[in-house]
Amino acid sequence: MSITGENIRNIAVIGHSGEGKTTLCEAMLFNGGAVDRQGKVMDGTTVTDFDDLEKSKKMSVYTACAYLMWKDTKINLIDLPGFYDFEGERHEGLRAAGGALLVIGANGVLPIGAESVVDYCLRLGKPLIIFINGMDKENADYFGTVRALKEKYAGKLAPIQIPIMENGKMQGCINALQEKAYRFTADGAEEIPIPDELKAQVEEMQANLMETAAENDEVLLDKYFESGELTREETIHGIRLGIASVNTIPVMAGSALQNRGVINLLNEIVAYMPQANERTNTLATDLAADKVVNIQPDPAAPLAAQVFKTVIDPYSGKLSYLKVFRGALKSGSTVWNANAEREERIGQVYVLRGKKTEPVSELSAGDIGAVNKLGVTSTGDTLCDINAKVKFDAIHFPKPTLFMAVSAEKKGEEDKVFAGLSKLAEEDYTFSVEKNAETGEILIGGQGDTQIEMLVKKVKTRYGVDMKLTEPKIAYRETIRAVASAEGKYKKQTGGHGQYGHCKIRFEPCGEPFIFDEEVVGGAVPKQYFPAVEKGLRESLVSGPLAGYPVTGLKAVLYDGSYHEVDSSEMAFKAAAALAFKEGLKNCLLYTSPSPRD
């Protein structure tokens, strides 16, 4: 199945945890015929929350992709976790998305995290639709939620729907752009006349939409000033321009759980969100010309694709999610990995529907899919034509903010623990694992308690090893508060040539871990011995004189000394520097402090 870019929409589904993102994805998949029945998060039966951890926690933890067909258009849904600890998943998914669908509850307030995720999409230039969910609940407050959004995004917000409420619940909706009303039925929705009591609201919303449309196009703006109105087609055209330029954010409403308003949403995604061949601001470096170029989504051009996520399964191996930005990725082809600077053999190409993979012959420009068992490819890598080498910018992930020590419950399984955690670090670039040489501990870092808890459980599930978490031991450093000078003289006489090295060194506090400099005049210490002095000092940094901790924040300046034409050697000056270090730091008001992380 190869579909061209004009018939593809790549939509990241975003929002805070618990707002109904996965349920909305499930409803869209059901309406598109991708599933026979609409699964539920609470039952663990949804397409995009397929991992055992997600099923047990009743929340999205990993990025998942699933496609559906709607009106001859392929919609690739990218379901992103909403919890803060999994922010890295958002960075991955939005790299592949052409637009975003923000899901928020109809609670009359701006939800936690909504502002940051909207702002992030706007910075990336990702067109956005807002879906106010939960309109089946009693006292659902659509207009209160719209007002809360307008307080932050007044100049961009464009509500296009009016809910038809009965007994506090949404029973239908009016599309002000299309000037049509619908009542929800068991099979979807049926068109009805616009209720008389809502006609004034419809007219007011239409007037606002005309004004918004006019602001997105100079020709429309001139006509609007002259006549005070626009045709329906002109209004729709102006709104679409505004969405594409992220100047306009349309707002819709419904109930994902009850599958109400979802068909209207699918229609608007096809009508208003960018076609995959419309996004022309994708930049990459042309490696031959050494310049930044704009990658046009031309299916006939040489291949340019990027891996945006990696999943490693202990049984089936590595699965690389990718988006084709240009050309076509074909099963059985050989491509160039611009990051690893090596060829990569492509086996079978797949499209994704949750955990299910469907084999295809190729992915055309604008499409999203996956390839398994790539040898040298990691998240963020560029795959391209070997005769047209380009490289996309790396995906920038937040650095770990919480660090814990981890150990095996059973003695002798530490290597198994480290290997399992290292595999997870290949999947999640916000997670780090290292062995601390000073404390002997395995240290892991992540975005928060929830992420670390999930990763530990995942290692147990995948690799059958139990672990325990503890606070990391503190690795201390020694540093100095004052300036001091010292000399070191290494003199040794044996039967033949002796050993002689003599140096005078000034030690000062500094902001860098270590700086070596020299101020020797008159050749008191020949230049060929400067590296030996520096090496002797660097080797001495490993163990300070106060408590044996590594020394940091030290500047050492070699300013004088002496040498012997016959007996001096690099070894002698290295030893002399070590003696000066030991003597000098005794007089520098040493103190210890916890080791800062890079």
Regions found by a protein language model. Name each.
Residues M1-S593:
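Structural and coupling elements of P-loop NTPases
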